[in-house]
Swiss-Prot record:
The keyword Secreted does not apply. It is an enzyme of class 2 (transferase). GO terms for molecular function: protein methyltransferase activity; S-adenosylmethionine-dependent methyltransferase activity. Gene3D superfamilies: Vaccinia Virus protein VP39. InterPro entries: Methyltransf_16, SAM-dependent_MTases_sf. This is Ribosomal lysine N-methyltransferase 5. S-adenosyl-L-methionine-dependent protein-lysine N-methyltransferase that methylates 60S ribosomal protein L1. It comes from the Eukaryota. Keywords: Methyltransferase, S-adenosyl-L-methionine, Transferase. Its EC number is 2.1.1.-. S-adenosyl-L-methionine binds at W87, G141, S142, G143, D163, W214, L237. GO terms for biological process: methylation. The keyword ATP-binding does not apply.
């Protein structure tokens, strides 16, 4: 069962300690590496499927190109190179989101129990669109693989995939190579029309690539507007790995949430998936979010998440 654990300036430290105790408990069953999905291949097949697929299961198979040479370079993209490879957090999150019964409140919206709070439940807004509830997803720091964009474009009306300008060329190539995997919706793209498809379905997804370096946001790009979305979800998967990047990432998230609320009268929330590496990185992330920026941060507690090397947080204003 999924539970939300609200964190504050006191409980965050207990949470970090307990989460790493849990991580140690599962150490023998978890990969002891940096988290690159495939560290020995430039081209890889990424399958998003349940553990036991059936004929009715939605499954996806993507062929992704990555650059291990760029990852290891000290000169490429001003030494900002992690986006050139696929990290394991994205496939893990997608498989959990799509197939775990406990993730249904994220997919479709629903009440989730809240621990240690006067409020017994919190209503999560649906991450997946429905005819009466158009949804927009803004992915920050997507990386060149574009796996989340292709898979989630099947379920939302608008998907805005963003990263640094240098990442957009390989990202565009991977999206084009896998656009056929968006099978549940017709894709339309104003800025990259070659991504557009013609499916026999009235459901549509606007898929746009946007250059956005969250270390240097002078103004929020107009391309991030919500159009007619009832809700905007900001998605950040496995981008918390360096203490230097934590303040600009969280500042960008807060700025976007506030921009949607104040400039567009649209509620926005965020999901941040953290790969658990150094304990002090997670603590710094939570301290900056909760203490410095006064964001509301909930740890998403669920059996499969708990037994993984990842921690998922729900963040609101």
């Amino acid at each position: 069962m999924l539970q939300l654990c609200p964190l504050d300036e006191d409980t965050l430290y207990t949470h970090v300690y307990e989460r790493y105790v849990e991580l140690d408990r599962h150490a023998e069953t978890l990969a002891q590496d940096l988290g690159i999905h495939a560290s020995d291949a430039e081209t890889l097949v990424v399958d998003i499927a349940p553990a036991q697929p059936t004929k009715s299961s939605d499954t996806y198979s993507l062929t992704v190109s990555q650059s291990l040479a760029s990852l290891r370079s000290s000169t490429v993209n001003n030494n900002s190179t992690t986006g050139y490879v696929l990290w394991s957090g994205t496939p893990f999150f997608l498989c959990w989101l799509l197939y775990a019964p406990s993730a249904a409140p994220l997919r479709d919206g629903g009440r989730v129990p809240v621990t240690d709070s006067a409020a017994q439940f919190l209503q999560l807004p649906p991450l997946f669109s429905a005819p009466a509830r158009p949804v927009c997803v803004v992915e920050l720091g997507s990386g060149a693989a574009g796996v989340a964009a292709i898979v989630l474009a099947n379920y939302v009306d608008r998907y805005l995939v963003s990263d640094q300008k240098a990442i957009l060329k390989p990202l565009r190539a991977n999206l084009l190579a896998n656009i056929s995997e968006v099978s549940r919706r017709t894709v339309c793209s104003k800025q990259t029309p070659e991504l557009s498809s013609n499916r026999r379905t009235p459901a549509r997804c606007e898929l746009e690539l946007i250059a956005l370096d969250w270390e240097r946001i002078a103004t929020v790009p107009a391309a991030l507007r919500p159009t007619d979305a009832a809700h905007v979800h900001v998605l950040a998967l496995d981008v918390v790995y360096n203490d230097f990047l934590i303040p600009p990432l969280l500042t960008a998230i807060k700025r976007l949430l506030r921009w949607y609320a104040d400039e567009h009268a649209v509620k926005a929330t965020a999901y941040v998936l953290v790969h658990l590496r150094a304990q002090d990185i997670l603590q710094t992330f939570l301290e900056h979010a909760i203490i410095d920026l006064r964001l509301r941060c909930y740890y998403m507690d669920e059996e499969r998440l708990r037994s993984s090397r990842f921690a998922l947080y729900y963040v609101t204003l």
